Design a protein with these regions (language model features):
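PLD/PLD-like phosphodiesterase catalytic module centered on the HKD motif
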Residues: 1, 6-10, 19, 23, ...
């Protein structure tokens, strides 16, 4: 387990995308248009390599701009978002992170883990939200 903060979180997400072989599951509390470009590129590169990428975004009542994501993505929207974002790779490693105080401009805090038992629990959380969200179609 490693604690990451601020820009280290984004570096960790990029590294995880580069290591992905089969799947990336993402619960993002921010929209793709708000993500750093290098994060969008990491997801796009993974998709191009044949990695299955599933993403859940908050339903904010606006059109979702996916123009920075190139490739194939399964995208869903939900009104029920956890305060922290989660990225799960190959059901082996995951990172949970968010602002130390929700809805603030404070420090980003995160925790990366490569423990399969905890990754299985993260997968259950993801699947529960995914199955109860709506399919996004542009």
């Amino acid at each position: 387990t490693i604690t990451v903060k601020d820009m280290e979180i984004f570096s960790q997400v990029i590294s995880m995308c580069e290591r992905a072989d089969t799947s990336i599951d993402l619960i993002a509390s921010i929209l793709p248009s708000e993500m750093p470009r290098n994060i969008c590129r990491a997801f796009s590169d993974a998709s191009t390599r044949g990695v299955k990428v599933r993403m859940i975004f908050p339903k904010k009542g606006i059109d979702l701009d996916l123009s920075r994501l190139k490739g194939y993505f399964e995208v869903r929207l939900t009104n029920t978002m956890p305060a922290a974002g989660i990225i799960l790779v190959d059901e082996k490693e995951f990172c949970v992170g968010g602002l130390d105080v929700p809805d603030s401009m404070n420090t980003l805090l995160g925790m990366w883990m490569n423990q399969s038992e905890l990754a299985s629990l993260a997968k259950l959380i993801f699947n529960n939200i995914y199955e109860n969200s709506e399919i996004y179609s542009s």
